[in-house]
């Protein structure tokens, strides 16, 4: 594919990229079955835009399966689950399996085995039972319908990509600049161009990071999650669909830092 650069008449040919389908991050959705349709079901499908690996009972459990074994052993207790979204509602507090899952997730949270994302459906209750207090102690979000999915997903992905930087040589774009010895490299020049873009020119900054990612990843093994996320954010930007919190840029910079750490 040929992509014209925005700074000159140069055209860069993208050869190929190696995409790793597997990804170590697994997210568990904890919710009341009464909230499944349509809200949770639709949110699960929305997350597929980003290539996240999500444990969701409607996808992972089949007719005839042992429900408890699947939900608990392969779900909440699964050592591969390192993030969990807890959807609290009036239905949730009176639930059955979801409360058993929640208890396990909470125990794992206090052991630093997982990270919790508390989400309130509809309204945030003024008072909560003691066992649910952590949902208000932690930074939380609340959602009403599909219009809230994008902001929630971006918060989740921002945290995951930030955590990935623990295994990255670079923690910021500026770190890459300081480390780069070859000042004639196309990578170095594109990063400098990115830094020179006016901070308020948000659309151009996203486009710049996307093309930098395309070039940097063309001969390197990258995660399906990263590739889907970068593409989704870029194409949403092309449609001028952005949220006010501007999490997109933070996510893209995190992915660039991780990608360059394995160059």
Labelled PLM ranges:
Residues 1, 44-165:
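Cross-kingdom TIR/SEFIR domain
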Residues 161-184:
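Charged, amphipathic alpha-helical linkers/stalks
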Residues 1-83, 113-114, 188-263:
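Conserved N-terminal substructure of TIR/SEFIR domains
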Residues 146-152, 179-187:
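Short, highly charged low-complexity linear segments
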